[in-house]
Regions:
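Acidic, proline/glycine-rich intrinsically disordered inter-domain spacer in sigma factors
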Residues: 1-10
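Helix-turn-helix DNA-binding module
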Residues: 10-18, 26-43, 54-57
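Residues within the DNA-recognition helix of helix-turn-helix
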Residues: 47-52
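Short alpha-helical "packing" element that flanks the helix-turn-helix/winged-helix DNA-binding module
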Residues: 5, 19-20
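IQ-motif-like calmodulin-binding regions
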Residues: 23
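Short, basic, alpha-helical segments at the C-terminal edge of helix-turn-helix-like DNA-binding modules
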Residues: 60-62
Length: 62
């Protein structure tokens, strides 16, 4: 299952992959990721949710 998650993560574009990794794996908050990536925290949350949804869709097909 970890490999499937890694593959699903690799399907995301670079920025979304970084956001998902920082928020989910590393435990950063959206405002912290926003500072790191020079993004609005609401943009980080939107991209996180979209990235996770894309990963869910990929994993459901597997």
């Amino acid at each position: 299952e970890a490999t499937d998650i890694q593959i699903a993560l690799s399907k995301l574009n670079k920025t979304d992959r970084i956001i998902v990794s920082l928020c989910v794996v590393e435990g950063y908050k959206s405002h912290e990721v926003g500072k790191i990536l020079s993004m609005n925290p609401s943009t980080v949350r939107t991209r996180l949710n979209r990235g996770l949804e894309k990963m869910r869709e990929y994993l459901e097909v597997q």
